[in-house]
Amino acid sequence: MTSQAALKLVAKEEGDKQRALEAALAQIDRAFGKGSVMKLGEKGKVEIESVSTGSLGLDIALGIGGLPKGRIVEVYGPESSGKTTLALHVVAEVQKAGGTAAFVDAEHALDPSYAYKLGVNLDNLLVSQPDNGEQALEITDTLVRSGAVDIVVVDSVAALTPKAEIEGEMGDSLPGLQARLMSQALRKLTASINKANTIVIFINQIRHKIGVMYGSPETTTGGNALKFYASVRLDIRRTGSVKARDEIVGNNVRVKVVKNKVAPPFREVEFDIMYGEGISKLGEVIDLGVKAGIIDKAGSWFSYGSQRIGQGRDNVREFLKNNPDVAADIEKAVRKSSQKIEEELLVGGPEEGEED
């Protein structure tokens, strides 16, 4: 066979393949609707939409300016570390942008007055206090499938008690029941979350594994399914107290991006959570301004441009509170320097024994 004839045969085979592919795509479109299968390049550059976390540093650490829409997010940590506070800040940001938010309060512990102080619009917040885990996840699924809700917060996975456990006796042993419930629910939820472009935040608690000799003994409740399905996992820890003279007025908090499917993970950020106020934005503006070289720090004195803005962090915070224009200028400059700050926020990879 001549080389020309061989080329014609290859071209014919390629043409047959193309026609077969077109026929298959047409059949899929008829069966499942237009756009069920498409070439990735047809959509152009796929931009991931995000919602601010209410923390300037955490938005930078996440790499896309906040939490990704249409994804599952897990926020976990010890008790009183700021998990619900962080989730309520995200709810407030969604509402500010005109979105609809829902809060599935499985713990029956939501404080409306605290949520209001963080900027949550209580009149427009959908709240559910379900009786059992199945009911909580069914409500979450229905809200997501409606396509009308922008964020759903489930507080918390540990409180999603299966119906069989509630109806059983106090000492009954029901191994793996909650893990199976979460696994089944996430299989159902994940596709509809993506289609509806809804953020679903699962707040989770920490437990300790017995008999672990090496690596971290810590694990989260509800089995391994959530670890796999979550696009972003945030580990939040209280590292100290914020004091005004002798009075404790807040907590120092460290958040580590343990998993991130939309940007590089393992970034770590610290900020203050003030009692009755939430995340201290001005405190972050000062700290990140110093990191980016926008605010100069010499000893205990802080300067912005040629102007001295205060001695000591508390005095600088007070100055920025009284001069919101200066604070806004510094924040704008910090956001422009986000790439430089991102590199400084990078820490090591996962700790030994830490699961993805």
From Swiss-Prot:
Its main location: cytoplasm. The keyword ATP-binding applies. One of its GO terms (molecular function) is ATP-dependent DNA damage sensor activity. It is found in: Cytoplasm. The keyword Cytoplasm applies. Belongs to the RecA family. This is Protein RecA. It comes from Caulobacter vibrioides (strain NA1000 / CB15N) (Caulobacter crescentus).
